[in-house]
Every structure is written in structure tokens, then in C-alpha cells.
Amino acid sequence: LIDGSINRLLRGGRTAHLAFYTDLLDVLDLTTDERAEHTADWIALAADAPSPTAGRAQQTLTALFEAGRLPADRLAEMSQAVLFRPEKKLVRAQLVLLGKALRRSGEDRSTLLPATAAAFGHPDTLLQEKALKLVAAHLRPGDDALRTDLAFEAEHLGPALRRTAAALLGAIADPTDPAGYEETLPAPPARRPLTTAGRSLAETAELVAALAKTNAATTEETETALDLLVRHTHQDRTALAAALLPALADRHWARQDTGHADPDHLSGPELLAAAVLGRLDPADLAPQRPINGRGFGQHCIHDALQRVTTARAREAALRVLTDPLPFLLATPTWDCGTLEPQDLITRLTAYARHGCVPAPADFAQALLRVRRDPHAAAQAEALATDEGRRLAAWLTADGAPAPHTRHVTDRGPRTWWGGQQDMPRRIVLELPEHQFIQKEFPAVFHPLGRPRTATGHCWHWRGQELAHLAVLPQDRETQAVWLLPDLTGCAIGEDRGAGEVLSRLAELGGPAGPALHLAVATALGARHTEDRLAAVDALLVLAATGELDTALLGRDLAELLRLGTVKPNRLADAARTAAATGAYATTWAVLAGALPAVLDDGPARGAGELLAVAADCVEHCGAGGPLPEGLAPAAARKGTSQLATQARRLRTALDNPPATAERGRLTLTLGERGA
């Protein structure tokens, strides 16, 4: 039973799945000898098991130490693993255990002090400080070799502690030099041109067959396949059909004996391929035929976006059967979905030269994708066609996104039975009607231009959100308004996954205005780690492209913190991640505007953790300037709480240039006891 339970714990799994085996070991009440036989197993569990299981293993190893059955080398091995974990409770307990061991046998310091130094790299500066105090308390004047090893590990300390360690251990490589600080930001997203020229029939068939078997096609792949199918159909539909038939032979609709396929069951390139092979009835593709949506309710923007992409694919498939197009107008210039205005003007010119009538949905999609450049409007107007006139109007003020309104509400979306949910107070954005879309676009596009509120009911199948970004790749603000309810659900509820959409949205074009900044602020407080990481990616992308308004983002975070939409501890985790990439100055510039919200009306829970991240940023980048509102009273509080300690640390960092500031609160001397 003992061996089986321990082996099951070593295999890992969710905490709930492991609880039975830890409880069984408690019931079995192992003797000291039985525990000692599995020392290596306890160390492995303390290193890698889920936090509750690791805590049990740590307690078992502590009991072995108290019984004199845990040698110094085993304790060092255990400590190096545990001190690497992020859980502060486990790290704090391990440092206490190391302190006991060092007081029991000072001769083991050459083994235990290097293990203690593993905590120098922990994100929590208080734990770094505790480890440094422990080293200072037990390091002897003659320990030159040990001091050299510890100095190497001290490079991982925060700037203020690194200066203290330098006085204790001697020279430390790469000391912090605020005068030489350089912000590290990611490179701006690279754009790849989307080209379809020169692709053979065989390459087209191979691409279409691959996309028919996946639900994770990129915008680049889908748009390339659509345009290739249209181009080759116009040149030689018979030859294209001959290439497609063997590649798609395993598709049920491709068999000759199945009759016409149902277009509701096909999408994108596969729908066009079915048209090329003659498996679709033109009557089923008529514009007036209803499209089965993937959402529910008139307020579901995801359903509206899906209907737009479906309508364009059906339109192209119908033209394959009736009046083939030479190429598509809306094929993007870049992999992100953006269409350059000059490319669209060139395509419209070619259409006019060949007497080709543009497909309405394809042209409307092209307008939504085109980069807004007023200088190209004159060229568009010179085409002297209806499409040229509409393009010229779209490139100027008529096509500009409608400004949104902002307010705070506690009313949730209407339920399907007509009621309305009560929800925590939160910020909502509302869009007015976009008159140009309502007047000049086909009916299927009209929902994109209707007034939209975040309190409308929205239910839809997931999985197409990333593809929908390419419908409006030059309007991040409108898409951010649509995305905000999902991000708010990630912050105040159990929702997850919207952060990935946000990180991709930040890479698109168009203004990065208040809506996008509010979306990033909301996602920084998401419940789930992956959504917060995606929000950090979005923040860094905006910073790298010079579009991040740190003051605006800080004010949004302050409001969200006061409303309770964003929790301080979650924001601290996200900010710590952003700073760890090297963006200390950017992160501090954002936090400077957010901190008053957790300090002015009485310190909020988690404020100390947020202050610690802010202090880290200031110490690394050497920022100065006025103290955030509420910091001085927090720093004046008595006691050693994390809030007071970190407030004093931040105040000191802001008031004193890091190159000359002294760590007044922490003064260490060799052999000092009581740490």
C-alpha cells in the first residue's frame, strides 16, 4: 500500500485525483524508518507535485530532519528544488528549515548556503531578503570560496538587495546601473505578404485538401486557397476539377452518387471546391437563401461575423457555377488580413477593363479590410465606377469607425426567456449605428453596423474567433468593443480563452484607442493565467509599436480596481510577468496610475503584492518622480506587514536615485545571528 500510493503520487495528476493517496498514507501512519526509505520520493514530490501534495512531502521531510534522518546533502537537494517553486508558503517554510539546520550544525554551511541561494531568484523580494539574511547570519569571515559561489548566485537578486549583497559578498557580476538601463521590448509584429501568383493546380488541390481536414486554418491559408480556386476556375475549371477530385476523394460529398451537397455543411475553400466539382445546386447558393448561423440572438456579434464570411464564400461558389470571377477583390495584401488601398484600386481597374461585375459581398469585405488612406481616395474616385465612389467615401470620413460611449452598469445580458441578470458593477462600451455600412453594404453586413450594447444576449459556438478578426483587420477599436464582454467574463466569472483573441487583435491595424486599452486592462485581471499572459502579450505589442498610452491604461486599471472587476493580486501577477521580460519602465508607467485605486480608500487586499512589483520596476529602471496618491500614508504605517514594507521600499526607490540609494532597512554583517 505504501509503495503503490507513493508511486501513484509520483505519476502526478490533479490535486483531487491525488488526495485519496495522501490521505491513505496518513491513515497508514508510516514509521520513521518507512519514511526514510522513500526519502528520494519525498524530494521528488516536494519538487514537482501539485502544491498540496508538495506541502505534505515537505512536512514529511521536515519530520525526518527533526528525527536526524535527513543528511545535509539531501536537505540541500530538497531545498534547491523547493526554493525554485513559485509558492511563497513552501519557500518560506523551506527557509525556516534551512535556518534550523544551519543553527544545528554550522559546519554544513558549505552545503546548505549554496542551496539557500536558490531563493535569490524568487519573484518575491521579501523571500529574497530572508534568504540573504540567512546567508549573512551563517557565513564566516574565512569562507572565501563559498563567498565567491554565493556572489555568482546573487546576480539574481533585485537591484536594492544586489547592492546589499555586494557589500557582503564582494564584487557581483553585472551590478544594476540605472544610468545604463535600456528597456527591452519585443520586436513589432512582422507582416508577411500574401501571394497567390504562380501556384500550380497540384499545389492548389493539396492546400484545399489539407484545409478540408482541419479546423485551425489561418487567415493566410484560407484566403490563399479561396483566391487560387477562383483564379484557376476562371482559367480552366475542367483542369482544376481534375486536380481536386483525387485530392478530395475521401470527402463524403465528393462522390458522384450522393447528389448535390448541402452548403450548410460546407465552408470556405471546401465550399468552393464542391462548386468546382459540380456538387452544389446554384439555387441553394442564392443570396436570398437563409444562412444557418452559429450563434443565437440578434445581439451575437460572433454569429454576425460568421454569416459575413459564409455569405462571401457562398457568393464566390455561385459565381463559380454561373459567372466565374478572375480573382477576388478582398484577398488581403498581408497575412493579418489587411488590404492595401492601391491593391484594391488595381483590382477594380482590372475588373473594369474586362467588364467584370464585382461580387457585392466580396467588395464589401474588401472595404472592411482596406487600410484607410485618405490620399488614395482621389485615385478611387477617378475610377468613375460605383465601386470607386464607395471606396473613396470609405477611405475618408464616411468609413471612419463610429465613436463608442462608456458607462458603468450592474445589469447583465438579457436571458433567452426575457429576464435580465444582475452582475457585479462593470464598465460597458456601446456602439452607435454605422450609417455607411447600413446604407452601402449588403444586408448580411448590416448587423456589423447596428447599435450594439454589451448587455445584449450572446450565445455562440466557439472556435472561429481568431478567423473573425480578419473581417475588420483595420478597426481594432470596434473589435475591442465587441470583445470586452468576453474579457469581462474572464475577469469576474469563470470564462476563459478571450485573452488569445486580444493578443492577436493588438497586432492588427487601425487606431489603438480607449476601447483597446480598456480591453487590455480588463484582461490583465483575468481569472486564468493563460488569459493574463495573453493580455501581457497585447500590452507589450502595443508598447513595441509605440501605440501604448500608459497613462490611459493606468487610469482604466484604477477604475477597474475600484469596481472590483480587476483584483490586485491578479494584476500583480500580470505586471510581474510583463516586467520580467525587461519592460520595467513600461510596467511602472502603467502601475503608477493604477496604485492610487488600492491605496486611497484604505489599502485593498493584495495591495502589498502590487506595491512589491511596482518597487521592483522602479529599482530596475531607476524611475523617479512624484509619489502615487496614497503611497505616503501607506509607507508611514507602523509594523512589518507586506503593505507597509513594500510601500516604504517603493517610496525609497522613488525618492532616491538608485545609483546612490542605500538600503537603510537591511544592514547585514558576517556571523549575525537571529535571521
Which residues make up each language-model segment?
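Alpha-helical structural signal with a strong bias for long, charge-/Ser/Thr/Gly-rich
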Residues: 1-78, 82, 90-92, 96-114, ...
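DNA-binding alpha-helical recognition surfaces that contact promoter or target DNA
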Residues: 133
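Catalytic cores of large soluble enzymes that bind and process phosphate-bearing ligands
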Residues: 123
